[in-house]
Amino acid sequence: MTLPTRTLGALTVSAQGLGCMGMSQSYGTGDETESVATIHRALDLGVTLLDTANVYGAGANEELVGRAIRDRREEVVLATKFGIVRDAEGHQAARGDAAYVKQCCDESLARLGVDHIDLYYQHRVDPDTPIEETWGALAELVEAGKIRYAGLSEAGAATIRRAHAVHPVTALQSEWSLWTRDIEAEIAPTCAELGIGIVPFSPLGRGFLTGSITSASQLGEKDMRAGLPRFSEENLSANLAIVDTVKALAEKRGVTAGQLALAWVQAKGEHVVPIPGTKRRTYLEQNVGAATLELTPEEISELDAVGEGVAGARYPEHLQRTVGR
């Protein structure tokens, strides 16, 4: 099966990718057998873009993805990331000095079991290292044949411009969904101007927009959402009105709420490639079903209004400080 394709800068990928993070962390206990089967099913369905990072599962996610694609490497546009460091207590910081960038790349290549990475993202911007140093190192990795293209994640517009002046930014990864629209003010227009693709993660609002989460009590102790302001019991209850509206519109169209939410993100432009994450084939197939779903202008307008007045911040304050730099 083939899916429509889109372009991220000069890189051609399937119109929808697969986020693999949840297979190894953040959303409860993983099942490697089902995760590998999900990756294989994604490839069977025509998904080419697989997304991981060195920090997911402390390297375990890259290893899992590497095992899954060992005999199917030629079918995959492989994306991974560097730049988030965590201490023993789980506190998060960013690092982007040249030596570290190159070290991380070599380590990711080894974990993935590949000789090159197709799209290598700077996961977070290091406020203590000039972006020019980080991107100079990425340009050298391209020259060495270790990576094909370079991207940014959660960077601000000014930083995107500075990085792009050193070496072309192929893609900008950021959270973008019906209830997270921060990038629309300045970052998305900057990407459009510079010919940079956008890869929205959590396009389903970390699962909330599917309608499957109606109470904070559903979130287990290993579920990162339990620590996010929007998923507190009070805010989650207030935000259920958003899901009710999406579900009603989806029912009219004969699709699921999640499919409608994904189609809204996809409608943002031919340079936009969402990467909904899942570790189960059932949800994967629902998501891929949205890849060819086109919304009417009226549907888009109705959905645009849904995200106004979301209760709760996207991240706790200490994490919010790390995005948009």
What are these regions (language model features)?
Residues 88-182, 186, 197:
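Glycine/proline-rich, positively charged
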